[in-house]
Amino acid sequence: MWRDTPGAMWRDTPGVRWRLAAPRPVDDPALFLTRLRAEAQGAPVALGLDLPLGVPRAYAARRPEAGFLPFLDTIRAWPDFFRVCAAVPEIHPERPFYPARGIKGMTRAAHAAALGFAGAGDLSRLCDRATPERPAGAPLFWTLGANQSGKAAIAAWRDMLLPALARERSLVRLWPFEGRFRALLAPGTVTLAETYPAEASRHLGLRLRGSKRRQSDRAAAAPALLAAMARLNVAPEPALVLAVTDGLGSDAAGEDRFDCLLGVLCVINVLEGHRPDGTPDDPWLTSWEGWVLGQTAVPETVARSGRRPAR
């Protein structure tokens, strides 16, 4: 979850390449990336975000922009883009998020039809779809349910990403739209990449028994998490070891802290060269849809749009 982030810092120490701090809340989202760059003292910052970075190709096919990055510039002038629709008649391309609350007759098929899509499957990006290794993620524009990601995208894009891009565009880089992940890392910059906890746990060889919403089940995963850190030459701070052993807290934010930890380990896993830092060979991914960092499994069923994106 982008609102809580564990800090990882590279260290050239024998047997230790990374030191990992416990997750902490983000204070001012608009200045979050600036603060990370300041704390890095000129070193490159790599940041994994558990939320969508990109839009589905069925939506993108109707846009005049060349890709997701210029699209972000466009929506800055759309006052209602982030206002979630309460009813289907309110849905249109400049106000695509739905629904504001659960109501009778609410379906993803109706949502898709209101956006001019052929079916509910068009709401999903390729990386949202189920693979042989994990279940499907939720579509970007859908905002209801425990598994939805729309509200996180709204908060992060509106309150963190757009302000940062407006203030310091040359210092903020988005993967995979601007290149391979490791190649984007440069002194004084911050590079953002989408991560997905269900994907990251498989990259790290973790098999959570039970539910990550339960503290006891998260605590039971502590030995595997600490072992994954050791394999990656990560030295967790004592406070983090205690938190992981305790299941990352008894409050509702414990699940978010758990996902944060998976996300930062996913990023380190890629930086260490254990997972690829690119995408499958599909121009939609690097222009509009984005991809999940480190993912190699590709869904068998792919929704095809009517035109190819601009290269």
Regions found by a protein language model. Name each.
Residues 1-10, 15-46, 51-311:
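RNase H-like (RuvC/DEDD) metal-dependent nuclease/polynucleotide-processing core
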